[in-house]
């Protein structure tokens, strides 16, 4: 309920901090906060940073003994297209949660490529970590390891349902509904 939230100095609920120190560079572009717990009862929060075709997930763990949140761990990065092997920036739409002893993330990718056949996002992507904190031990669906942050979404790609559609015209394939 709303009475559990702390108002900011303007009487609203937008905060640029998790630990009482305003940090504009880390909090200004965050949206869609989600919370989950692991088997140890630790509380995690993840958010999307950035926009549709250039967004990233980052997450933080709450430490009850110090009443503070950890620094953000970046699952992926914004501006991935700046990497030499990545052609386009991309954002992700999906969910991060802890299920059956693993931190897991499933998503669809939305590329900044405006000339591909997809309208909005495409693909099925999945990764998991055996580390309850999610800080290390990430693997794709085939069990191949990778380090965070993830730059190349194709490394965690499970499948592309859009491949079953025979077209190369832009914005013709729509596979978004009810994904998450």
Task: Please annotate each region the language model reported.
Residues 1-180:
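Extracellular, repeat-based ectodomains that mediate carbohydrate processing or recognition
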């Amino acid at each position: 309920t709303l009475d559990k939230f702390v108002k900011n100095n303007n009487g609203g609920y937008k905060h640029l901090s998790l630990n009482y120190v305003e940090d504009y560079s880390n909090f200004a572009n965050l949206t869609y906060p989600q919370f989950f717990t692991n088997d140890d009862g630790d509380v995690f929060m993840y958010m999307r940073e950035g926009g549709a075709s250039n967004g990233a997930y980052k997450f933080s763990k709450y430490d009850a003994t110090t009443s503070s949140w950890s620094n953000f761990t970046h699952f992926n990065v914004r501006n991935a297209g700046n990497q030499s092997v990545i052609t386009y920036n991309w954002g992700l739409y999906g969910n991060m949660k802890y299920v059956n002893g693993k931190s897991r993330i499933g998503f669809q990718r939305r590329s900044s490529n405006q000339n591909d056949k997809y309208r909005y996002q495409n693909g099925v992507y999945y990764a998991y970590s055996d580390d309850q904190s999610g800080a290390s031990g990430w693997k794709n669906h085939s069990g191949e390891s990778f380090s965070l942050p993830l730059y190349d979404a194709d490394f965690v790609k499970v499948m592309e349902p859009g491949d079953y559609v025979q077209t190369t015209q832009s914005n013709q394939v729509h596979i978004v509904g009810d994904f998450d």
